[in-house]
Protein backbone atom coordinates (compact mmCIF):
# COMPACT_ATOMS: atom_id res chain seq x y z
CA UNK A 1 0.00 0.00 0.00
CA UNK A 2 1.00 3.61 -0.60
CA UNK A 3 2.68 5.31 2.38
CA UNK A 4 0.07 8.08 2.15
CA UNK A 5 -2.64 5.60 3.24
CA UNK A 6 -2.92 5.69 7.03
CA UNK A 7 -3.77 2.66 9.16
CA UNK A 8 -7.24 4.07 9.87
CA UNK A 9 -7.88 4.54 6.15
CA UNK A 10 -6.70 1.00 5.50
CA UNK A 11 -9.03 -0.36 8.19
CA UNK A 12 -11.96 1.50 6.63
CA UNK A 13 -11.06 0.07 3.22
CA UNK A 14 -11.05 -3.46 4.64
CA UNK A 15 -14.40 -2.90 6.35
CA UNK A 16 -15.91 -1.60 3.10
CA UNK A 17 -14.66 -4.68 1.24
CA UNK A 18 -16.21 -6.99 3.81
CA UNK A 19 -19.53 -5.14 3.52
CA UNK A 20 -19.43 -5.46 -0.28
CA UNK A 21 -18.86 -9.22 0.01
CA UNK A 22 -21.87 -9.48 2.33
CA UNK A 23 -23.99 -7.55 -0.17
CA UNK A 24 -22.99 -10.05 -2.86
CA UNK A 25 -24.54 -12.94 -0.94
CA UNK A 26 -28.05 -12.08 -2.11
CA UNK A 27 -26.99 -12.89 -5.68
CA UNK A 28 -25.66 -16.36 -4.83
CA UNK A 29 -28.95 -17.97 -5.83
CA UNK A 30 -27.61 -17.39 -9.32
CA UNK A 31 -25.23 -20.33 -9.62
CA UNK A 32 -23.18 -18.44 -12.19
CA UNK A 33 -22.24 -15.65 -9.76
CA UNK A 34 -19.06 -16.28 -7.74
CA UNK A 35 -19.16 -16.24 -3.94
CA UNK A 36 -16.19 -13.88 -3.93
CA UNK A 37 -17.32 -10.72 -5.71
CA UNK A 38 -17.57 -7.21 -4.28
CA UNK A 39 -20.92 -5.48 -4.74
CA UNK A 40 -21.70 -1.83 -4.05
CA UNK A 41 -24.92 -0.24 -2.82
CA UNK A 42 -28.19 -0.60 -4.74
CA UNK A 43 -26.76 -2.87 -7.42
CA UNK A 44 -29.19 -4.78 -9.65
CA UNK A 45 -28.18 -8.10 -11.27
CA UNK A 46 -30.88 -9.99 -13.17
CA UNK A 47 -31.51 -12.74 -15.74
CA UNK A 48 -28.60 -14.53 -17.49
CA UNK A 49 -25.53 -13.10 -15.74
CA UNK A 50 -22.23 -14.85 -15.00
CA UNK A 51 -19.64 -13.07 -12.83
CA UNK A 52 -16.28 -14.59 -11.89
CA UNK A 53 -14.43 -14.06 -8.62
CA UNK A 54 -12.60 -10.95 -7.46
CA UNK A 55 -14.78 -8.72 -9.64
CA UNK A 56 -15.99 -5.39 -8.22
CA UNK A 57 -19.41 -3.96 -9.12
CA UNK A 58 -19.79 -0.27 -8.24
CA UNK A 59 -22.72 1.45 -6.53
CA UNK A 60 -26.03 1.80 -8.38
CA UNK A 61 -24.90 -0.31 -11.33
CA UNK A 62 -27.46 -2.36 -13.27
CA UNK A 63 -26.53 -5.60 -15.06
CA UNK A 64 -29.34 -7.30 -17.00
CA UNK A 65 -28.62 -10.45 -19.00
CA UNK A 66 -32.00 -10.74 -20.71
CA UNK A 67 -30.81 -12.08 -24.07
CA UNK A 68 -29.74 -15.14 -26.03
CA UNK A 69 -26.47 -15.68 -24.12
CA UNK A 70 -26.67 -12.92 -21.52
CA UNK A 71 -23.83 -11.11 -19.74
CA UNK A 72 -20.51 -12.77 -18.90
CA UNK A 73 -18.00 -10.90 -16.73
CA UNK A 74 -14.58 -12.46 -16.14
CA UNK A 75 -12.23 -12.57 -13.15
CA UNK A 76 -10.81 -9.51 -11.44
CA UNK A 77 -12.88 -6.96 -13.36
CA UNK A 78 -13.93 -3.56 -12.07
CA UNK A 79 -17.27 -2.12 -13.18
CA UNK A 80 -17.63 1.48 -12.01
CA UNK A 81 -20.58 3.06 -10.23
CA UNK A 82 -23.76 4.01 -12.12
CA UNK A 83 -22.97 1.75 -15.10
CA UNK A 84 -25.61 0.07 -17.27
CA UNK A 85 -24.74 -3.29 -18.85
CA UNK A 86 -27.94 -4.39 -20.56
CA UNK A 87 -28.52 -7.03 -23.25
CA UNK A 88 -32.03 -6.02 -24.30
CA UNK A 89 -33.50 -2.53 -24.44
CA UNK A 90 -37.03 -3.87 -25.00
CA UNK A 91 -38.90 -7.13 -24.53
CA UNK A 92 -40.08 -7.49 -28.12
CA UNK A 93 -36.66 -8.52 -29.40
CA UNK A 94 -34.08 -10.17 -27.16
CA UNK A 95 -30.47 -9.06 -27.38
CA UNK A 96 -27.49 -11.35 -27.87
CA UNK A 97 -24.56 -11.17 -25.45
CA UNK A 98 -22.01 -9.04 -23.63
CA UNK A 99 -18.72 -10.80 -22.92
CA UNK A 100 -16.27 -8.90 -20.69
CA UNK A 101 -13.01 -10.82 -20.34
CA UNK A 102 -10.65 -11.03 -17.33
CA UNK A 103 -8.99 -7.95 -15.78
CA UNK A 104 -11.16 -5.38 -17.55
CA UNK A 105 -11.88 -2.03 -15.88
CA UNK A 106 -14.82 0.13 -16.98
CA UNK A 107 -15.22 3.67 -15.63
CA UNK A 108 -18.28 5.16 -13.97
CA UNK A 109 -21.47 6.12 -15.85
CA UNK A 110 -20.75 3.78 -18.76
CA UNK A 111 -23.36 2.10 -20.97
CA UNK A 112 -22.86 -1.23 -22.73
CA UNK A 113 -25.74 -2.53 -24.83
CA UNK A 114 -26.00 -6.11 -26.03
CA UNK A 115 -28.52 -6.01 -28.87
CA UNK A 116 -25.90 -7.98 -30.82
CA UNK A 117 -22.63 -9.55 -29.67
CA UNK A 118 -20.21 -7.34 -27.71
CA UNK A 119 -16.76 -8.55 -26.65
CA UNK A 120 -14.27 -6.57 -24.52
CA UNK A 121 -10.85 -8.25 -24.51
CA UNK A 122 -8.85 -9.04 -21.38
CA UNK A 123 -6.63 -6.45 -19.66
CA UNK A 124 -8.44 -3.53 -21.30
CA UNK A 125 -8.95 -0.34 -19.27
CA UNK A 126 -11.73 2.11 -20.09
CA UNK A 127 -12.50 5.61 -18.81
CA UNK A 128 -15.81 7.06 -17.66
CA UNK A 129 -18.87 7.44 -19.87
CA UNK A 130 -18.06 4.66 -22.32
CA UNK A 131 -20.96 4.08 -24.72
CA UNK A 132 -21.33 0.89 -26.79
CA UNK A 133 -24.25 0.56 -29.24
CA UNK A 134 -24.15 -2.76 -31.19
CA UNK A 135 -27.11 -1.92 -33.40
CA UNK A 136 -28.00 0.92 -35.73
CA UNK A 137 -31.29 2.15 -37.15
CA UNK A 138 -31.93 1.74 -40.87
CA UNK A 139 -33.21 5.00 -42.36
CA UNK A 140 -32.86 4.83 -46.17
CA UNK A 141 -36.58 4.51 -46.98
CA UNK A 142 -38.14 7.98 -46.98
CA UNK A 143 -41.72 6.67 -46.96
CA UNK A 144 -41.46 4.61 -43.77
CA UNK A 145 -40.82 6.01 -40.28
CA UNK A 146 -37.26 5.31 -39.17
CA UNK A 147 -38.44 3.49 -36.07
CA UNK A 148 -40.21 0.94 -38.31
CA UNK A 149 -37.32 0.23 -40.70
CA UNK A 150 -35.48 -2.14 -38.38
CA UNK A 151 -31.85 -2.17 -37.30
CA UNK A 152 -28.48 -3.56 -38.28
CA UNK A 153 -26.85 -5.86 -35.71
CA UNK A 154 -23.20 -6.45 -36.56
CA UNK A 155 -21.79 -6.28 -33.03
CA UNK A 156 -18.80 -4.55 -31.44
CA UNK A 157 -15.40 -6.04 -30.64
CA UNK A 158 -12.69 -4.47 -28.47
CA UNK A 159 -9.30 -6.19 -28.44
CA UNK A 160 -7.03 -7.15 -25.56
CA UNK A 161 -4.75 -4.79 -23.63
CA UNK A 162 -6.38 -1.59 -24.90
CA UNK A 163 -6.59 1.80 -23.22
CA UNK A 164 -9.79 3.68 -24.01
CA UNK A 165 -10.24 7.26 -22.81
CA UNK A 166 -13.38 8.76 -21.31
CA UNK A 167 -16.53 9.52 -23.32
CA UNK A 168 -15.69 7.15 -26.18
CA UNK A 169 -18.55 5.76 -28.29
CA UNK A 170 -18.55 2.53 -30.32
CA UNK A 171 -21.21 2.14 -33.02
CA UNK A 172 -22.55 -1.03 -34.62
CA UNK A 173 -20.01 -2.98 -36.68
CA UNK A 174 -16.98 -1.23 -35.20
CA UNK A 175 -13.94 -2.91 -33.68
CA UNK A 176 -10.41 -2.21 -32.51
CA UNK A 177 -7.52 -4.66 -32.39
CA UNK A 178 -5.20 -5.59 -29.55
CA UNK A 179 -3.06 -2.97 -27.78
CA UNK A 180 -4.89 0.03 -29.17
CA UNK A 181 -5.18 3.44 -27.50
CA UNK A 182 -8.33 5.50 -28.09
CA UNK A 183 -8.37 9.23 -27.32
CA UNK A 184 -11.06 10.74 -25.10
CA UNK A 185 -14.27 11.71 -26.88
CA UNK A 186 -13.60 9.59 -29.95
CA UNK A 187 -16.39 7.93 -31.94
CA UNK A 188 -15.42 4.52 -33.34
CA UNK A 189 -17.42 3.78 -36.50
CA UNK A 190 -15.27 1.21 -38.35
CA UNK A 191 -12.68 -1.54 -37.86
CA UNK A 192 -9.13 -0.76 -36.72
CA UNK A 193 -6.05 -3.03 -36.62
CA UNK A 194 -3.73 -3.86 -33.70
CA UNK A 195 -1.25 -1.41 -32.17
CA UNK A 196 -2.64 1.95 -33.27
CA UNK A 197 -3.49 5.28 -31.63
CA UNK A 198 -7.02 6.30 -32.62
CA UNK A 199 -8.48 9.79 -32.15
CA UNK A 200 -11.41 11.85 -33.40
CA UNK A 201 -15.05 11.88 -34.40
CA UNK A 202 -15.25 9.89 -36.56
CA UNK A 203 -12.05 8.29 -35.27
CA UNK A 204 -8.94 7.95 -37.43
CA UNK A 205 -5.52 6.40 -36.96
CA UNK A 206 -3.01 8.98 -35.75
CA UNK A 207 0.00 6.67 -35.60
CA UNK A 208 1.19 3.14 -34.98
CA UNK A 209 2.32 2.38 -31.43
Feature map (PLM): residue ranges:
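Generic cytosolic/nucleocytoplasmic N-terminal low-complexity/intrinsically disordered segments
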Residues: 25, 52, 75, 100-102, ...
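A residue-level signal for beta-strand positions that form part of recognition/binding surfaces
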Residues: 36, 155, 195
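Extended, small-residue-rich solenoid/repeat segments and analogous flexible loops
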Residues: 1-54
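C-terminal/domain-terminus segments
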Residues: 72, 175-199, 203
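Short linear functional motifs in flexible/disordered or boundary regions
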Residues: 33-35, 49, 67, 89, ...
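Flexible, glycine/small-residue-enriched loop-and-beta-strand segment within the central core
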Residues: 57-172, 201, 209
Amino acid sequence: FDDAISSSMLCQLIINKIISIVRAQKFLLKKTVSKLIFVGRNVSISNKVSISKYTVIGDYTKIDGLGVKGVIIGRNCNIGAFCRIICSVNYRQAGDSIDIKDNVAIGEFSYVGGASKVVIGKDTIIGQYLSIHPENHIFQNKTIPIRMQGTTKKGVNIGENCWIGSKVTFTDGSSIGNRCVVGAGSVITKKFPDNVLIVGSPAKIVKNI
